[in-house]
């Protein structure tokens, strides 16, 4: 299982991520409010400004204080590390 640090020691399963988006647009604000109403919102900002909204395959919405680009970079780094590990295990 691949895990991604989304800030302040909070970690999310990379396999469950559907999208990482900015919270600025009206549709995303609406998604956040709907998730809050349904009890499916996870606020991992520790009171700081929300900079990334993470949408999971279970319809949970996670708020993060880390930039979407940073989360995506961490995800890509994990995937590259995983690919190298997979290749190494095949050749051994």
From Swiss-Prot:
Region annotation (Disordered) ranges: 73-92
Highest taxon of source: Bacteria
One Pfam family hit: RemA-like
Coiled coil regions, renumbered to chain: none
Residue spans of biased composition, Acidic residues class: 82-92
PANTHER family per UniProt: REGULATORY PROTEIN SSL2874-RELATED, REGULATORY PROTEIN TM_1690-RELATED
HAMAP family named among the record's database cross-references: RemA
Family to which this protein belongs: Belongs to the RemA family.
Protein name: Putative regulatory protein Ccel_1792
Source organism of the structure: Ruminiclostridium cellulolyticum (strain ATCC 35319 / DSM 5812 / JCM 6584 / H10)
